[in-house]
Design a protein with these regions (language model features):
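Bacterial signal peptide processing site
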Residues: 18-22
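N-terminal lobe/hinge region of extracytoplasmic solute-binding protein
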Residues: 37-93, 124, 196-202
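Gly/Pro-rich hinge or "lid" segments in bacterial periplasmic/extracellular proteins
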Residues: 68-76, 170-227, 231, 241, ...
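Aromatic- and charge-enriched surface segment that lines or borders ligand/interaction sites
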Residues: 88-132, 148, 154-156, 243-246, ...
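Surface-exposed binding/hinge segments that line
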Residues: 101, 135-182
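Alpha-helical secondary-structure segments
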Residues: 115-122, 150-156, 201-202, 229-231, ...
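Ligand-site clamp/hinge motif
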Residues: 191, 218-265, 398-402, 408-412, ...
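Detector for C-terminal structural segments
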Residues: 209-213, 218-220, 278-283, 312-346, ...
Length: 549
C-alpha cells in the first residue's frame, strides 16, 4: 500500500474539495499550499504515542510546547529558548521548580482556552504505564506538576540538573485534558481523538487518508499569528524514485532527504534549492538480544558475537558505495556534530580474519560442503529487516549480506513497508534490523530512550532490548553534573562503553540535503527538526510543474 505513486491531479482535487467544509476552510482554500513528499505515513497524531519522523512533523505543527528552542539547540539552562505556549517562566530560588505562565490568549482548536491543568494532564499521560509512551524516560527526575492557578503550571524536580528547562520545555507537548481525560489510556491509539486531533498550534487538523495523504490547515486566529501557508499537505510516496521525481517535476515542494542521482539532478535544477540542514541522524544494525536465532537462545546477547559481526563488516567501503560523499561511517549512537563527542575514541576495527577466529571460538565452524558456519547442525543465519522506503538502507542490507557471506554467515534481507517494519521492531519480532534514529539534542534523553536498559515491558525505543548497567550508571551521573568538563568526560566514558560492547553495528551518519522548490524561502531548518519554523517560511513565487525528467 505504500507503493502508491504520487498523482498531482488527485492531490489538488482532494485539497480543493475540502473548501466547503466550514468557514475556516473557506478562508484558506485558495491560500498557498505547501506539499511535502514523504516516504511513509504518520504513525500516530497524539504526541505521547508518536515515534516516526512523519508523525513528529505533523504533531509539532498541531500541538505546542511550553517553550521553543532557537537554532543553536542549547540544552543547558533556558537561554536557548523562546516562549511558545508559555509567555514567561520563573525559577524558584533553589532551582527545584519552574513556574510557567500560560499565554492567556492560547486556545485549543475547538475554541476552549488552554489552561495550566492541561500541562499537568499532559505529563501524567506521558508517564501512565497504560499509555506505554516510548517517551516516558524523557521525564525521569521530574517529581510532579502542580497548578498554582488557571494559567500557572509549576514543574517540580527531585534534583537540580543542568538540563531541567530543556527536559520539560523540549519534550512535553501539551494536549487538551477536556477531550482526552475520559479516553481509555490503554486504547488511546484507537480513540476518536487519534483520528481527529485537536491542538493549539498554528495549524489545525483537517484530513487524513491513511497511507496516502494528510492535510493540516492554518489556524487564522492563532495567538502566535497566522502561518504563511494556508495548508500543508503530506503525500505518502514510498517509492524513493517517485518521491524524487515529484519534487524535480514541481508537483511537490519539499523532499526532506535527496540522495544519489536525484541529488545530482536537484543540484542542476533551477527550480530547486538543495539545502544542507545538519544532521542528528545515525543508522545502525540493531540486534535483538533476547531472540532465539539459529537455534541459539539470545544469540545476539553474547558480546563476542556482536563484536565479531562488527569486525566482519567493512563499514567504510559500504558508506563509499552507498553514499559516496553524502555520509560518513557512524562512530556510535551520536553524530559528529554533538559537542559531547570525542571523534578520536576507540572503535572496533574491520578485521574479517579476527572475526572468523572469534566465531570459531564460539563454536561456529565453517562447513566444507556449503561454506556456511554451523553449530550443532544449525547454520549461522539471521533475517535482516529493512524499510522498503529507504533506498540507502536497502543498499546497506545487500552489502551486509555479501560481506557476511564471505565469512560463512547467511543473511536473509527482508524489505518491509514502513508500518510493518515499525510494528515488528516494537513487538521484538525480528532478528536484526537496519534502523535510523534522529538523536535528541540532549545526549541524556537520546541515550536513555534508545539504549537505556528496559524496565519490564517498558522498552522506550530500545528495540534490541540492550542492557548495560555501567552505561546506565554513567548516564545517571552525567545527568546531575553541572561542570561542563566533567559532563563531557562522563559522556565520553558512556560512549566508549557502548561502542566497546558493540550494542549495535554503527553504520553511517548521513549528510542531510533537502530539495525545496525555489519559490520557497525556508527559515530555521534545525538539525533535529527541519520543519520547526515552517509556519514562517516565505513564498516568493508560484509553483510551476514541468514534465517529469
Amino acid at each position: 500500500m505504500f507503493a502508491r505513486r504520487y498523482h498531482a491531479l488527485a492531490l489538488f482535487v482532494t485539497v480543493a474539495a475540502c473548501s466547503g467544509k466550514n468557514a475556516e476552510s473557506t478562508s484558506v482554500a485558495s491560500a498557498k499550499v505547501l506539499t511535502i513528499a514523504t516516504p511513509a505515513d504518520a504513525d500516530a497524531l497524539i504526541p505521547q504515542l508518536v515515534q516516526s519522523t512523519q508523525g513528529k512533523q505533523v504533531t509539532d505543527l498541531l500541538f505546542d510546547h511550553l517553550a521553543q528552542p532557537t537554532n543553536n539547540l542549547e540544552t543547558v539552562g533556558d537561554a536557548g529558548f523562546k516562549p511558545q505556549l508559555a509567555s514567561a517562566w520563573t525559577w524558584a530560588p533553589d532551582s527545584l521548580s519552574i513556574a510557567f505562565s500560560i499565554n492567556p490568549a492560547a486556545r485549543w482548536h475547538d475554541g476552549q482556552p488552554v489552561r495550566a491543568k492541561d500541562v499537568q494532564f499532559s505529563l501524567a499521560l506521558y508517564n501512565d504505564a497504560a499509555v506505554a509512551s516510548p517517551h516516558a524516560s524523557n521525564f525521569i527526575g521530574i517529581d510532579s506538576i502542580s497548578v498554582r492557578d488557571s494559567l500557572t503550571a509549576v514543574v517540580w524536580w527531585k534534583h537540580r540538573s543542568p538540563e531541567q528547562f530543556f527536559q520539560i520545555a523540549f519534550n512535553l507537548a501539551i494536549v487538551p485534558e477536556h477531550l482526552l481525560a475520559k479516553e481509555a489510556r490503554a486504547t488511546l491509539a484507537q480513540s476518536a481523538f487519534a483520528q481527529h486531533p485537536v491542538g493549539s498550534g498554528q495549524y489545525r487538523f483537517e484530513q487524513w487518508t491513511h497511507d496516502r495523504q494528510l492535510i493540516v490547515a492554518a489556524d487564522s486566529t492563532n495567538f502566535r499569528g497566522k502561518p504563511n501557508f494556508g495548508r500543508v499537505v503530506w503525500v505518502v510516496t514510498a517509492d524513493p524514485t517517485a518521491a524524487s521525481m515529484s519534487v524535480l517535476s514541481g508537483q511537490a515542494d519539499v523532499l526532506e532527504s535527496v540522495r544519489g542521482d536525484a541529488f545530482v539532478s536537484a543540484r542542476k535544477s533551477p527550480q530547486l534549492h538543495t539545502i544542507e540542514y545538519g544532521s542528528l541522524d545515525y543508522a545502525f544494525m540493531v540486534m535483538n538480544t533476547e531472540r532465539t536465532v539459529s537455534g541459539n537462545r539470545r544469540l545476539f546477547g553474547d558480546r563476542a558475537m556482536r563484536v565479531a559481526l562488527t569486525a566482519a563488516l567493512n563499514r567504510q567501503a559500504m558508506v563509499s558505495n552507498a553514499l559516496d560523499s553524502l555520509g560518513a561511517v557512524a562512530l556510535g549512537p551520536f553524530t559528529r556534530s554533538a559537542s559531547s563527542v570525542d571523534t578520536t575514541m576507540r572503535q572496533i576495527a574491520f578485521d574479517s580474519v579476527a572475526a572468523g577466529r572469534t566465531l570459531d571460538s564460539l563454536g561456529w565452524k565453517v562447513d566444507a560442503t556449503d561454506k556456511l558456519r554451523k553449530k550443532n547442525g544449525k547454520a549461522l543465519k539471521f533475517e535482516l529487516l529493512v524499510p522498503s522506503s529507504s533506498a540507502t538502507r536497502q543498499k546497506f542490507g545487500v552489502l551486509i549480506q555479501a560481506q557476511l557471506a564471505s565469512i560463512g554467515v547467511s543473511v536473509d534481507v527482508a524489505p518491509l513497508e514502513p508500518g510493518m517494519f515499525a510494528t515488528r521492531l516494537e513487538k521484538g519480532d525480528f532478528d536484526a534490523a537496519l534502523n535510523m534514529w534522529r538523536a535528541d539534542p540532549s545526549p541524556i534523553v537520546s541515550l536513555r530512550q534508545v539504549w537505556g536498559a528496559p524496565h519490564g515491558k517498558e522498552i522506550g525505543a530500545n528495540y534490541g532490548r540492550y542492557a548495560n548497567a555501567q552505561f546506565d550508571a554513567t548516564l545517571d551521573t552525567a545527568a546531575l553534573v553541572f561542570s561542563a568538563d566533567k559532563r563531557k568526560a562522563l559522556f565520553r566514558r558512556a560512549y566508549q562503553l557502548i561502542v566497546d560492547d558493540a550494542a549495535a553495528v554503527w553504520l553511517y551518519e548521513p549528510r542531510n540535503f533537502a530539495a525545496i522548490n525555489a519559490r520557497i524561502e525556508p527559515t530555521g531548518m534545525r538539525a533535529d527538526a527541519w520543519w520547526a519554523d515552517l509556519p514562517n517560511w516565505n513564498v516568493v513565487g508560484s509553483r510551476v510543474a514541468t514534465a517529469k525528467p
